[in-house]
Amino acid sequence: MSDQQLDQHELQQEENKLIAQRKEKLAAVREARAIAFPNDFRRDAYFADLQKQYADKTKEELEAAAIPVKVAGRIMLNRGSFIVLQDSSERLQVYVNRKTLPEETLAEIKTWDLGDIIGAEGVLARSGKGDLYVDMTSVRLLTKSLRPLPDKHHGLTDTEQRYRQRYVDLMVNEETRHTFRVRSQVIAHIRRFLSERGFLEVETPMLQTIPGGAAAKPFETHHNALDMAMFLRIAPELYLKRLVVGGFEKVFEINRNFRNEGVSTRHNPEFTMLEFYQAYADYEDNMDLTEELFRELAQSVLGTTDVPYGDKVFHFGEPFVRLSVFDSILKYNPEITAADLNDVEKARAIAKKAGAKVLGHEGLGKLQVMIFEELVEHKLEQPHFITRYPFEVSPLARRNDEDPSVTDRFELFIGGREIANAYSELNDAEDQAERFMLQVKEKDAGDDEAMHYDADFINALEYGMPPTAGEGIGIDRLVMLLTNSPSIRDVILFPHMRPQA
């Protein structure tokens, strides 16, 4: 057994000992009273609200007012005379007043452990140091914690353990709680932003018979009653566009997508996506709308449009750079010429040298995107709209009027990561059918991420879809930016993990 394994074994033995002691205390509670886990305590204040409401009250003013409160929380520190509680908003001290609390209560308090949840009544007071606290007149145990909290000096520092036991991480790490409060604020702000502009929030199927709307590998399942294969959706796009056909001209959805692909600091098999569509608009309108949304979000969440991330600062207050795929390759790789990019064999050689997985059947547009992904994407630090994607890799996007070999599409990159994907939607049913057929050929040639042929979607387009612009924004990656989080697992409450050995 290694030293590390020995240390782990000793720690586990110590934890088991503490758990056994706590179970003995719970047994004593069960014996002493009929209900060991009562549910009749009603608090009337959160700690943060008390701190804010009475911030300007002096010690003398609080003594004179004798403001009664009922509070509840988890014991995080026990200093003898003062117990530090934590609720969902803040921490606050409660004072163990030996003059007012009954002897039996004082005796019971001595048996309480860190992690126990208590309810207390008393009056607000302020210490000589200026700290607000509750001078308790009564207190009781509401929930006995059977497992000890992480060591107060080291906390929960093992990253993988934080992800696996997020409930403990949330208990002991204020930074984690802040991250998920920000996530909630971001989603709420997006909903307000779009609703105020006339968008209708909708819900579309998670289980689909044909996985469409993105180039990705789906999760497959089986519907027993219908005896048919079904797929967890990889994107809601084709259903949202059906709604535009039906007459809902501005729609959005914030929900989960599922992709049966790799796990990394940027990828989780289950992730949250915003998709929105607006009729009588194009992809340039969406660029303007996206810039406005991102500036508002940063200002709302951070109080500034300068977004710190690692050792960099992203400037959301400045106009986002707009470059085509083709021009971005030339800008960031001066050794590559336009002639190189327009020659299939030269482009294939560049893509291979850059490390792309070249199968041999790719067209020029696909090769250009491969080169972009390998040689440009990671260099796009400040916000960049990369536009005019080749039609081969944009099967649902409208062709550009001036150059039909590219589409009216953009992807937004910040910090070298794709944050959003948008385009003027293809509403020509015959063109869409042809592109689906090309995707089927790609799939037959070995491209697992190529799209299926969706006959019902073609049927919908044949009724006529107005000129439309659509966009998808990855909520998880956006929250990573706004919370300075290095991994997507930091912003997903319960990320998927490999099984423990």
UniProtKB/Swiss-Prot annotation:
Task: Name the catalysed reactions.
Answer: tRNA(Lys) + L-lysine + ATP = L-lysyl-tRNA(Lys) + AMP + diphosphate
Q: Which residues bind Mg(2+) 1?
A: E411, E418
Q: What class of enzyme is it?
A: ligase
Q: What is its main location?
A: cytoplasm
Cofactor(s) this protein cannot do without = Mg(2+)
* Residues annotated as binding Mg(2+) 2: E418
Which keywords annotate this record?
A: Aminoacyl-tRNA synthetase, ATP-binding, Cytoplasm, Ligase, Magnesium, Metal-binding, Nucleotide-binding, Protein biosynthesis
Q: Which domain of life is it from?
A: Bacteria
Q: Which CDD domains match?
A: LysRS_core (cd00775), LysRS_N (cd04322)
Q: Which GO terms describe its molecular function?
A: ATP binding; lysine-tRNA ligase activity; magnesium ion binding; tRNA binding
Q: Where in the cell is it found?
A: Cytoplasm
GO cellular component terms, semicolon-separated: cytoplasm; cytosol
Q: Assembly and partners?
A: Homodimer.
Tell me the protein family, please.
Belongs to the class-II aminoacyl-tRNA synthetase family.
Protein name per UniProt: Lysine--tRNA ligase
From the UniProt record, report the name of the gene that encodes this protein: lysS
